[in-house]
Amino acid sequence: MTNNMTRDQADKIAASIRQKYSEVAKNPEGQFQYPTGRKGLEALNYDKGLIDKLPDAVASFYCGVGNPFSIGKINPGEHILDVSCGAGVDTILAAMMAGPNGSAVGVDIVPEMIARAESNLKMTGIDHARFQATAGENLPFPDDWFDVVISNGAINLIPDKERVLTEIHRVLKPGGRLMVADQIGAGSVQKDFEARLASWFQ
């Protein structure tokens, strides 16, 4: 493991992520220190024409920390992977941009989030997106498969960042793009693991 973290410690973090986000899958309102739902999408300057196409019930589950699409555009016909997709709002928006000749796949380790993402997808009627329960560190896709990989507020939660970035590089086509919106910690890192675990989501 990287960051001098043991496997048991990494497993504890994964369990805490599953616990928190299984609750977020029920209702993200009040779970974060920043705007969520349609207000979050608008505050982060997502394309109004796209977010207006989202049913309110889908938009309400947006809980990203930034706008990965502000980094670059998704072109029609491209194939996109969303790492740690949560409720799938960014995945769905990517599928809209890619159009019917493209595709979008969202992966997440939280089964409840995948179930929510699939429910959200059904409400949109989009048929060129799908979701899969898997970890970003073990992507079940061939080499050179995707044109774009996106991630929103998630890589910071993954203990083994070197491994997840290596996997992302593997599945990206040569010349592919990585578009990440995320947050970082400021100040000193807690030395005690239990204190680090308690502050993992702050």
Regions found by a protein language model. Give the residues of each.
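Conserved SAM/SAH-binding beta-strand->alpha-helix loop
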Residues: 110-112
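Hydrophobic beta-strand segment of the Class I
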Residues: 80, 149-150
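Conserved alpha-helix/loop element of class I SAM-dependent methyltransferases that forms part
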Residues: 34-79, 90-97, 116
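N-terminal auxiliary segments of SAM/dcSAM-dependent transferases
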Residues: 2-44
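A short glycine-rich, Lys/Arg-flanked "PGG" loop and its adjoining helix->strand segment in the class I
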Residues: 99, 162-179
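Short, glycine-/aromatic-enriched active-site segment of Class I SAM-dependent methyltransferases
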Residues: 184-202
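Conserved SAM-binding strand-loop segment of SAM-dependent methyltransferases
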Residues: 124-138
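A short acidic, Gly/Pro-enriched loop at the edge of an enzyme's catalytic core
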Residues: 76, 137-148
